[in-house]
């Protein structure tokens, strides 16, 4: 057996603590934060460190900047965090430059410093040892509370852990909660266990689907990825999204499900249009009658009813991936309805981060879900049974 090094086991008193957070939050065109859930999720760990008299250095990425640009600055995050905590947050002008180093070295007990966007440093995504060493030199203790990036071997996630021994590094409360939830979900789900998998591509979820099959009782497949499965069953899908090279794999999954006695549900109708836009003329059509030149962009009302029926006796529901192009209003109905049904069920409901969390927030159902993961990719990889680069260095065999 193995366990995770925890923030609770570290002597934090008056220490300088580096916390890797995930403040990769959505913003509108005026850079206003539209959903601060990830910022709020980090507060318990930050508060715990402050209560122990720590000087707290926070670090995160935001977006995928190719260069240093003000639209990727963490300044709006600093302001929102300060408001949420009713406490000043000092903002550094850089990551490991003169300003950051000066502010980090002068940081006093119970003060908070937020470094600028980690990805302004090219070495972050390259897992660069030198960057990791520079970041590590700022603090006595390292805490990872950024589940959303734990599947990435990045400098502030993996390389940095080499510069702290086991008594000076650990997982924050959010990271521990995420890992606990995912492993319990896979090892001890209340049954029937229903997985709802959507999103655009089969390729990104192939491994998760294969891994889930022996564990679930029912599997609902929606979103753009459903068309590869429908094509595998011999349907004409018009111009709908198709991964031609994965038709064979889709067939294998359908066959494996059958052999395991897992009931697999695919859409029976779709909301179709000729273009993917708000102005497009749309119509509901059975999956066997999608016209040439048209594409399915959401599940239709009959699919919604079928999926609702499939969810009716569920005791555990894991949902990862929207049912359609939810960013466009007229193609969001299937995803919104699914969100309502899942939130109204009596099951333990786990939402696998990313776009799905956005759908749930838009539907106004966030408070009704049992658990909303802060990381889409990371939660998928945990479900796939993979070891996460950010978690592995914080994991010890219980005999150690």
UniProtKB/Swiss-Prot annotation:
Keyword S-adenosyl-L-methionine: no
Enzyme category, top tier: transferase
EC number annotated for this UniProt entry: 2.7.2.3
GO molecular function: ADP binding; ATP binding; phosphoglycerate kinase activity
Reaction(s) the record says it catalyses: (2R)-3-phosphoglycerate + ATP = (2R)-3-phospho-glyceroyl phosphate + ADP
Keywords: ATP-binding, Cytoplasm, Glycolysis, Kinase, Nucleotide-binding, Transferase
Localization per Swiss-Prot or TrEMBL: Cytoplasm
GO CC list: cytosol
GO annotation (BP), single: gluconeogenesis
Main location: cytoplasm
Pathway: Carbohydrate degradation; glycolysis; pyruvate from D-glyceraldehyde 3-phosphate: step 2/5
Residues that coordinate or bind substrate: 22-24, 38, 61-64, 119, 152
Entries under InterPro entries matching the protein: Phosphoglycerate_kinase (IPR001576), Phosphoglycerate_kinase_CS (IPR015911), Phosphoglycerate_kinase_N (IPR015824), Phosphoglycerate_kinase_sf (IPR036043)
Residue numbers binding ATP: 205, 296, 327, 353-356
Binding partners and assembly: Monomer.
Family: Belongs to the phosphoglycerate kinase family.
Protein name, per record: Phosphoglycerate kinase
């Amino acid at each position: 057996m193995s366990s995770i090094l925890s923030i609770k086991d570290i002597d934090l008193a008056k220490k300088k603590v580096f916390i890797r957070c995930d403040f990769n939050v959505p913003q509108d065109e005026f850079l206003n934060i539209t959903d601060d859930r990830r910022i709020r999720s980090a507060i318990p760990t930050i508060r715990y460190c402050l209560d122990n008299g720590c000087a707290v250095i926070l670090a995160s990425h935001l977006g995928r900047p190719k260069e240093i640009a003000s639209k990727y600055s963490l300044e709006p995050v600093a302001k929102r965090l300060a408001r949420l905590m009713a406490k000043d947050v000092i903002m550094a002008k850089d990551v490991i430059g003169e300003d950051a180093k000066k502010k980090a070295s002068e940081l006093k007990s119970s003060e908070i410093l937020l470094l600028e966007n980690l990805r302004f440093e090219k070495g972050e995504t390259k897992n660069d040892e030198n960057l990791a060493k520079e970041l590590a030199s700022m603090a006595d203790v390292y805490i990872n509370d950024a589940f959303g990036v734990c599947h990435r071997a990045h400098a502030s996630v993996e390389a940095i852990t080499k510069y702290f021994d086991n008594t000076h590094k650990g997982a924050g409360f959010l990271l521990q909660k995420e890992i606990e939830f995912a492993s319990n979900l896979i090892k001890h789900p209340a049954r029937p266990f229903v997985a709802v998998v959507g999103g655009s591509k089969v390729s990104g979820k192939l491994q998760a689907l294969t891994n889930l099959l022996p564990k679930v009782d029912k599997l609902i497949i929606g979103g753009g990825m459903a068309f590869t499965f429908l094509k595998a069953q011999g349907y004409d899908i018009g111009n709908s999204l198709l991964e031609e090279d994965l038709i064979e794999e889709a067939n294998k999954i359908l066959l494996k499900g059958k052999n395991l006695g897992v009931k697999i549900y695919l859409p029976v109708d779709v909301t179709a249009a000729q273009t993917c836009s708000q102005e497009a003329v749309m119509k509901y059509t059975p999956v066997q009658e999608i016209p040439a030149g048209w594409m399915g962009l959401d599940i239709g009302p009959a699919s919604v009813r079928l999926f609702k029926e499939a969810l009716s006796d569920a005791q555990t529901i894991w949902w990862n991936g929207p049912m359609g192009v939810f960013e466009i209003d007229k193609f969001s109905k299937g995803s919104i309805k699914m969100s309502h049904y899942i939130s109204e069920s009596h099951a333990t409901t786990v939402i696998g981060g990313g776009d799905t969390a956005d759908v749930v927030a838009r539907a106004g159902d966030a408070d009704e879900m049992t658990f909303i993961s802060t990381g889409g990719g990371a939660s998928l990889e945990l479900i796939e049974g993979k070891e996460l680069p950010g978690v592995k260095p914080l994991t010890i065999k219980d005999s150690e």
